[in-house]
Amino acid sequence: MPPIKRQPGGWVLPGYKYLGPFNPLENGEPVNKADRAAQAHDKSYSEIIKSGKNPYLYFNKADEKFIDDLKNDWSLGGIIGSSFFKLKRAVAPALGNKERAQKRHFYFANSNKGAKKPKNNEPKPGTSKMSENEIQDQQPSGSMEERGGGGGAVGSVGGGKGSSVGISTGGWVGGSYFTDSYVITKNTRQFLVKIQNDHKYRTENIIPSNAGGKSQRCVSTPWSYFNFNQYSSHFSPQDWQHLTNEYKRFKPRKMHVKIYNLQIKQILSNGADTTYNNDLTAGVHIFCDGEHAYPNATHPWDEDVMPELPYETWYLFQYGYIPVIHELAEMEDANAVEKAIALQIPFFMLENSDHEVLRTGESTEFTFDFDCEWINNERAYIPPGLMFNPKVPTRRAQYIRQHGNTASSNTRIQPYAKPTSWMTGPGLLSAQRVGPAGSDTASWMVVVNPDGAAVNSGMAGVGSGFDPPSGSLRPTDLEYKIQWYQTPAGTNSDGNIISNPPLSMLRDQALYRGNQTTYNLCSDVWMFPNQIWDRYPITRENPIWCKKPRSDKNTIIDPFDGTLAMDHPPGTIFIKMAKIPVPSNNNADSYLNIYCTGQVSCEIVWEVERYATKNWRPERRHTALGLGIGGEENVNPTYHVDKNGKYIQPTTWDMCYPIKTNINKVL
C-alpha cells in the first residue's frame, strides 16, 4: 500500500504541483495541462485506495485516462508522464478490467508473430477451434488472393515442428461447418506406415494368367503415401446430404494436411514373444511432391484413400509406378525399336528430393491451393431444344420430300415443334466388351504401337482401356455405365454399384438420323459446334480430382466419371521409414525393424453457392427413407453398424446420394 503520510510537497517534477507520486490532493492551482491531468489522476488513485486496492501495482482506468489526456501534450512533463504510464501498461497486470487484460494478452501474442502476410478474408483450413458463427463472419472479398499454381504445397524442409516425448503436437479434429459461401470439412485418422521392400527399389513384371497377353511392368519403392482423393473421406453421409440438398454448386479451394503425434516403435522378436518398444532416435522421411516431379500416385477410384470411418486405422499403401509399356520393352528377337525404348526407361528415386526426417513427437504440415471448375448440382428439367413458348406461331418453314417420288412441299413448322440450334454432346456407343469373363480388356482401348516394334500379345498388350466413352449419350449397354465395388478386394463380399440416370435432360441424350421412312440411332457422335451437355453426375463415393496429363494439345477436358481434371492437383505426400543399419559379422544388409503410427488431419475449404429458386412446387431431396437395411441380422440401416461392428455400405447408386437429381435449373 502507498504511504499513509505523504511528504509535504510530494515527489513531483520541478515546477509542477501534481505531476509525481505522493503529493497532497490539494496543492494549489495546476501550472499547466499536464499538471491538471496529474491532479485528476491523483484523485482517482485516492478513490481506488479507499476501495481497498493498490493502484500503484496494477494498470488501471485512471492510468488509461491520464494517457488519453496527454496524447496531444508535448510539454516536457507531459511527455515524461505519458511515457511512464505507457510503460506501466505494457508490463503491469490490469486491475479489474478484463477487456484491458485481453488486449494486453494479444499485445504479447502479436509480438511473437512472423512477418505480415497479404490480407485475405477467405476462411483458411486449420479453423478447428472456431465456432460456426466465426466462420460465417469470414466472407471473401471481391477478389480472391493470387495463387501461384493450382496445387502447390507449403512445408518446411530440414526439421518439423516438434515437442518432447509425452507431449502432444496436436489434437483430433473432426466435423464440418456450413455457411452461405464456404463449407469447411475437418477429418483426422490414425495411420500406420511400415518398412517396404526391405528399403529397396525393385522392378516387377505383372503377368496375370487370365489377361490374354496383357502384362505390366512396375517399379516398386520403399515409400508409402497419403491419398485424400475421395469425397467420402471428407464428408459424412449426413454432411453430403446437407451439401447436395442445399447448394447448387461447389468446388474445393484450399486443403491443409497436418501429420503429427508421431510414434516410432521398434519390433523385437524373441522366439514366440514380440515386444514393441518406443524408439526415440529413429525417424521417418516425409516430403510433398508439390511440383509433380514423380509419377502420379493418387489415381481415381483406388482403394488407398483415407478411410471413411474416423476410427479405422489407415494402413498406407506402397508406392509404385509404371516406367514403360512392358510389351514394348521385352526386346524379343533383338528388336531395334524395343531396344531403343528399353534404353529410355526412366528410374525415379524419391530420395533425390529434399525432405524432412522426423522423430517421435514431431509434426509437419502442408497447404494446397485448388484451381478447378465448379461441380454443378442442378438438373435440367427440359432439354435446350424446348426453350420456347409453344403457344406462339413461328415464321420458320420446313422442306418435305415425299417418299418414293420427286414431289416435295414446304410447310410452316408447328408452334410446339420449333427446331433448335443445340445439339447433343459427343460420345461413342458402338462397341462392346471383348474377351471372356475376367478379361482385362475394355470396350474401347487406346494403343501405342510404334512402327517396327514386335507386338506378339495382341493389341491388349500395348493398349489401355478407358472409361465408358458414352459422353452425355444414353448408355445402351452395361459396358457404358460406371460401376464400382464398395468393399475392398479380397473380402469375398463384392457387390457392385451401377450408376443410374440422373433424370437430367442434359444427360442421357441420343442422336437420331432420319431417312424418309424412319429414324436410325447414331451410335457415335463426334465433336461439333453448339453441343450442349452437363458433366457426369458424381456421388459421395466418387474421386474428387484427376491429374490432367502434360501434353502439347488437347480437346475439351471432361472426365467420364465427373472428376475434376486439374493441371496441378494436390501434390502427393510421401513417407517412408528411415533405414537404421546394424552391424553384422559378414556385413549383411541388416537394419532395425521399425514402424511408425500417428495422426493425420485433413481440412478442406470448399467454395459453395446456395440454391435459390422461383419454383412453386416442392423438389426432391435426399432423405434416409431411400436407404436400405442390412447387417448380420438384416435389421441395421445403411451407414450404420451391426452387432459385429460391420459397417453397412450403400448397395445402390441412389443410396450414394448422386448430384443433379434434386434441384431444378432454368436453362
Swiss-Prot record:
Region of interest (Disordered), ranges: 107-159
Q: Does the keyword Hydrolase apply?
A: yes
Task: Point to the regions of Gly residues compositional bias.
Answer: 149-159
- Please give the Gene3D superfamilies that the UniProt record associates with this protein: Parvovirus coat protein VP1/VP2
Placement of sequence motif Nuclear localization signal: 610-621
Entry keyword set: Capsid protein, Host cytoplasm, Host nucleus, Hydrolase, Lipid degradation, Lipid metabolism, T=1 icosahedral capsid protein, Virion
Q: Does the keyword Hydrolase apply?
A: yes
Disulfide bonds, which pairs?
none
Q: Which reaction does it catalyse?
A: a 1,2-diacyl-sn-glycero-3-phosphocholine + H2O = a 1-acyl-sn-glycero-3-phosphocholine + a fatty acid + H(+)
Pull one GO CC term from this UniProt entry: T=1 icosahedral viral capsid
UniProt signal peptide: none
One GO-annotated biological process of the protein = lipid catabolic process
Q: What is known of its domains?
A: The N-terminus of Isoform Minor capsid protein VP1, VP1u, contains a phospholipase A2-like region. VP1u may play a role in the disruption of host tight junctions in the airway tract. A nuclear localization signal is present in the C-terminus and can be recognized by cellular nuclear import molecules. After assembly, it is hidden because it is on the inner capsid surface.
Regarding protein family, the annotation reads:
Belongs to the parvoviridae capsid protein family.
* UniProt-recorded name of the protein: Minor capsid protein VP1
Q: Which gene encodes it?
A: VP1
